[in-house]
């Protein structure tokens, strides 16, 4: 039975670590995301803190003795808690037998309004239902099959930083993964398939009061269906390892904007995504050369062919009163787009690992990673018809000037089908050192123990894809610029004895738009986190208590001015701040536990510099994080 569980864990590791190509472009993220929150997977569900896009404290990394309950391989587990007036609960059942293992999980979140540090109410909230079903079959040591289904539904997700709310988001994910061969990947074929069904609806009237019947009521609906397949083969020979693979993805993406009418059918007046279909073909190879016990080199290559077609490129709406995406792209980028674009990307990464002892590891990475723009960056065709039609007569110009003053840049987000590949050329240095008796934070074999390390990254980016404003009419456009990105991370963890520990980490990031000689937008400020923790035993189990001090410096560099750039950054949110959390936990013999804490104990009023990202809000308003608040959760394993 233990061996079967090891199969399941190793199979997961294969698909998340070794199975991921080192040179894959997915490691590069957009400068500003606008997507639903991450999925709540079964391994996270029992220790999960309700997600708040306006509070970036990393409370999921705090030490709690209840984690042992949450991670135990028990047949049935429950958690339920109240977090600052919001509720989260989850149930998980899991099983394993001689040739089969599985898990079933359900979760529910009801997030409500909260007050900031000044006592002001913040219009925050959502309802979320999540679930997962996983079944694994291990007929023998050379075969494993795994079936997974994930469901995530988010309703009434308020977006106080944006002009529209996300009234409904659903994600259904079906996965099949299989292994044929040795589980240690000596001679193994892995293959699988995945289907993702994503639906979203955003509007400005379902969750907020409409001030006037004459107010524009936009409704955006998005449908996306993604099929992908992969095949990869691993071979171990003479202490070396090679993995070669192929993947194919078909992405069907539709997004429509409507003018909502109270007493008539909704009328489509723009394309968020003009019926885009994308075929992505990838081949990749990872080759690891083990020179000796201390030295190893890994070379990774990835080649991608991306063929995209905007099927509604020539579709004019409302009997031609609203122009087609082709005409919109031509107006803003001056090139006639035929609806098709084929791009190729070649990426490579070289990693050198030096492991002088079992407690030391150093790494050096040199990479050239290319990212092709996503569907919204390349094909969004949201526009304002009042601004699109140039005025000609004096009366039209007068009316246009009056409307332009109030509608500058609104409802206009124009993708760029002619974007070049984003090319990241970076060097990365990493180090990790620990004592021989260090098993983890607050976990030592004996006496005191430590771990510390860090990472330095310098990235010279050619053709970084950014959003910008067109000063003519305020429209959001997408363009390429050259940029420099630098980041430094450091961490240290020290267990003074079996009962007491401390950890500290710091991160600094610098981003410069070299083409325009200005700062990149949405670059996180310097931040330090310090945790002090204590744990001990009592007659019925264990307990812990701890504190976290989070200090964020003032961000002096940003894209603050709509007259010279995008203007997405806000000076009010660029102020520095410091907050403190206190927390504690009880564990009764690994069967029942409680987790409680007080966040922002000094009731500090502040807002995060990195704005909310559940939707693509390119002109966000300031939303303050929660003030002082309390949480209490219960955890059980049967």
Q: Where are the model-predicted features located?
A:
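C-terminal beta-signal and adjacent terminal beta-strands/loops
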Residues: 19-23, 35, 39, 49, ...
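Short strand-turn segments of transmembrane beta-barrel domains in outer membranes
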Residues: 37-95, 104-106, 120-124
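Transmembrane beta-strands of outer-membrane beta-barrel pores
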Residues: 48-50, 80-84, 97-99, 108-112, ...
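Transmembrane beta-barrel wall of Gram-negative outer-membrane proteins
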Residues: 84-110, 119-155, 165-188, 231-239, ...
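Membrane-embedded beta-barrel scaffold of Gram-negative outer-membrane proteins
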Residues: 100, 190-204, 355, 361-367, ...
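Flexible loop and strand-edge segments within Gram-negative outer membrane beta-barrel domains
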Residues: 111-118, 122-128, 142-226, 255-259, ...
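Outer membrane beta-barrel strand-and-loop segments of large Gram-negative receptors
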Residues: 132, 218-222, 226-232, 276, ...
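Gram-negative outer-membrane beta-barrel transporters
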Residues: 293-294, 306, 445-462, 478-560
């Amino acid at each position: 039975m233990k061996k079967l569980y090891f199969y399941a864990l190793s199979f997961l590791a294969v698909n998340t670590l070794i199975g991921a190509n080192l040179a894959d472009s997915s490691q590069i993220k957009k400068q500003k995301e606008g997507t639903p929150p991450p999925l709540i997977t079964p391994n996270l569900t029992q220790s999960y803190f309700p997600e708040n896009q306006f509070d970036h404290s990393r409370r999921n990394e705090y030490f709690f003795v209840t984690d042992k309950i949450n991670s135990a391989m028990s047949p049935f587990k429950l958690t339920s808690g109240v977090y600052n007036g919001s509720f989260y609960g989850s149930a998980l059942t899991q099983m394993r037998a001689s040739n089969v293992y599985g898990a079933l999980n359900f979760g529910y979140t009801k997030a409500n309004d909260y007050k900031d540090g000044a006592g002001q109410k913040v219009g925050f909230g959502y309802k979320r239902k999540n679930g997962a079903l996983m079944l694994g079959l291990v007929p023998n040591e050379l075969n494993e099959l795994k079936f997974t289904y994930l469901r995530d539904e988010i309703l009434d997700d308020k977006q106080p930083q944006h002009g529209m709310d996300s009234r409904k988001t659903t994600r259904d994910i079906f996965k099949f993964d299989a292994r044929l061969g040795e589980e240690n990947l000596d001679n193994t074929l892995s293959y699988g398939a995945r289907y993702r069904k994503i639906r979203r609806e955003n509007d400005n009237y379902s969750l907020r009061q409409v001030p006037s019947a004459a107010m524009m009521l936009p409704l955006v609906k998005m449908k996306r269906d993604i099929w992908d397949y992969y095949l990869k083969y691993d071979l171990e020979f003479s202490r070396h390892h090679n993995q070669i693979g192929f993947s194919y993805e078909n992405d069907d993406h539709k997004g429509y904007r409507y003018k909502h009418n109270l007493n008539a059918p909704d009328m489509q007046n723009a394309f968020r995504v003009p019926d885009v279909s994308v075929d992505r073909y990838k081949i990749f190879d990872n080759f690891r050369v083990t020179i000796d016990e201390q030295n190893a080199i890994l070379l990774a290559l990835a080649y991608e062919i991306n063929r995209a077609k905007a099927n509604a490129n020539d579709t004019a709406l409302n009997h031609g009163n609203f122009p087609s995406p082709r005409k919109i792209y031509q107006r803003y980028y001056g090139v006639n787009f035929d609806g098709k674009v084929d791009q190729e990307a070649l990426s490579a990464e070289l990693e050198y690992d030096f492991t002088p002892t079992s407690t030391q590891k150093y790494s050096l990475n040199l990479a050239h990673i290319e990212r092709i723009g996503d569907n919204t960056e390349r094909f969004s065709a949201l526009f304002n018809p009042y601004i699109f039609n140039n005025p000609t007569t004096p009366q039209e110009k007068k009316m246009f000037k009056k409307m332009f003053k109030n509608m500058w840049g609104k409802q206009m987000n124009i993708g760029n089908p002619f974007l070049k590949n984003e090319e990241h050329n970076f060097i990365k240095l990493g180090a990790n050192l620990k004592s021989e008796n260090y098993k983890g934070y607050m976990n030592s074999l004996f006496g005191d123990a430590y771990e510390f390390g860090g990472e330095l990254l310098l990235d010279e980016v050619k053709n970084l894809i950014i959003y910008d404003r067109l000063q003519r009419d305020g429209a959001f456009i997408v363009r390429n610029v050259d940029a420099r990105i630098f980041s430094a991370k450091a961490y240290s963890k020290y267990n003074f004895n079996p009962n007491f520990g401390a950890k500290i980490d710091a991160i600094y990031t610098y981003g410069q738009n070299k083409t325009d000689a200005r700062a990149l937008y949405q670059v996180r400020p310097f931040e330090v986190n310090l945790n002090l923790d204590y744990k001990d035993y009592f007659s019925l189990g264990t307990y812990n208590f701890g504190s976290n001090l989070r200090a964020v410096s003032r961000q002096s560099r940003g894209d603050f001015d709509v007259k010279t750039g995008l203007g997405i950054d806000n000076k009010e949110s660029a102020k520095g701040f410091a907050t403190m959390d206190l927390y504690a936990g009880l564990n009764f013999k690994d069967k029942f536990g409680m987790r409680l804490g007080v966040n922002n104990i000094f009731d500090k009023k502040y807002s995060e510099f990195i704005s909310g990202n559940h939707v693509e809000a390119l002109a966000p308003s300031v939303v303050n994080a929660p003030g002082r608040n309390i949480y209490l959760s219960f955890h059980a394993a049967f």
